[in-house]
Amino acid sequence: MIITLKDGSKKEYAEAKSVIDIAYDISEGLARAACAGEVNGEVVDLRTVLEDDCELNIL
């Protein structure tokens, strides 16, 4: 799956990942500061598992 981040960069994963796991992949500081995610415009919990291509913003 391909995750498109707010800045336009893309991350590719072979398996499903939670929003918090992706945040840790980007930066430990980001993951610690995160309180939610926004997936395709919808606010979701950090434990939400992403299985398909989407746009992600860490909040």
Residue ranges, per PLM feature:
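A glycine- and charged-residue-rich anion-binding loop/surface
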Residues: 1-59
